[in-house]
């Protein structure tokens, strides 16, 4: 007996309604859970309550932070959760305590660990770091400071439209994660703020950083050991210390860095442009298959630099040689101005010289004149127009 067409239509409609209901996200407003938008009342418990509800839900969840300023102490959002779709939709500002000592000895202010499928959309994170920077500048005994936003051992993370202001230490750290996308992120801190790296990536794969503007007192993006398949595109950096691979080789047994692409980036008034840096001591580390492409330098102190003799304070490494092996590094379409005469510097390991370095269509000037390139223990090729003249 044939099933009536109307019954089939009704059945399909019912299935669609059920699926739609399952897919519809549950929303928890932190204000409804006790958070106060006055910037003075501690709202940490309300945020943790929202997270507990979200993490226990089998449906997708939106944690909504309305307009206003919400004071948070250091907070840890831990997984695994029962769903893989939790979104923080932030219309307001999360504010760290004015007394930097409240969170200054915590590794992180806002920390996600063992989560999957977390999205942060919009919002401002105000780390209130200026007083701690002043403490450090005075030479007094100060806490080391907290990273503003940290992700550890987490997968499928998305961060978009987020602003991080005045972090005590690093602004954003991605550690031990896979498949992370950061888009339209803005980082802002004073050019003399200590150790305030914009985005730090280590022991992670499949990280993408797009369409972002970073102004800070340390590296705009720092790339640590164990990073692979990293893509950075359309990023403006300055002030800051540039985009740095390293420091590598701090530990004798260390994971390497490979498959990194940095393209369409602009450096303005930075200490470095494109930098690879390793400690001058033995290590199993490496950096290979690196592409730097389409970069503009505007009054940058060290536009292109490999430094394998990093030894801060001349402690723990004098008289030793870097064991980090650097190979297959390409600089393509790099142009602009250097604020120092040496615009290209390859200072590589005497034991493991840099190999397969390629310069292609590079033009860097110093005071509108020809700049200088220097090489030590570096080998490779040059193609197209290369100024300063290649020393490879």
Report residues per predicted region.
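Extracellular/periplasmic carbohydrate-active domains that bind, remodel
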Residues: 2-392
